[in-house]
Amino acid sequence: VLRTDGKENLMTSIEIAAAQDKEGKALVPEVCIFFENHLMRGNRTTKMNAENFNAFRSFNYPVLAEAGIHIKYNQAQIHVNKSKQELVPHYLLDTNIVVLKLFPGIQENVVATMLGTKGLKAVVLETYGSGNAPRKEWFIRRLCQASAQGIVIVNVTQCNAGMVEMERYETGYQLLQAGVVSGY
């Protein structure tokens, strides 16, 4: 027997997408995920479970709406674009990006290979905790070299909740000095 919450999620998603304010503008004018009675900002949401109905979480941002008998909108958290300009979608995105997830014992040849990728423009560096990384000389040197070549390196935490604070610990500060930028 297939058990699904898809019908309820779809119906409520359509209701929210169609909701308008007094001026006839979308009540929630942003990309969202609606799941298990919660509306979450799309770029702040992570799928945490492949089997449970409560599969998505927004760790560092509150829900935008909660559905029950009525839909309760969290207006203070919903982004309203005050610009008069129309949306101009960008279809040609640069995909010369790698995600470098750090792990204990990572070897120089692994880091060198990833940072040496032909045409590389950016690296998402997944660090420990609040932005910590290996303190090995070769690691910092490789990051400095990549940064000097114009490769943007963004430091993000591997943790589901919390953020990078590069000036909190010495290892994070070394990354900052190597040209790595905080991804928060």
Q: Which sequence ranges carry the predicted segments?
A:
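Short beta-strand segments
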Residues: 29-36, 101, 126, 156-157
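Short coil/turn connectors at secondary-structure junctions
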Residues: 26-30, 94-97, 118-121, 148-151
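Conserved active-site and cofactor/substrate-binding residues in soluble primary-metabolism enzymes
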Residues: 5-9, 26, 59, 95, ...
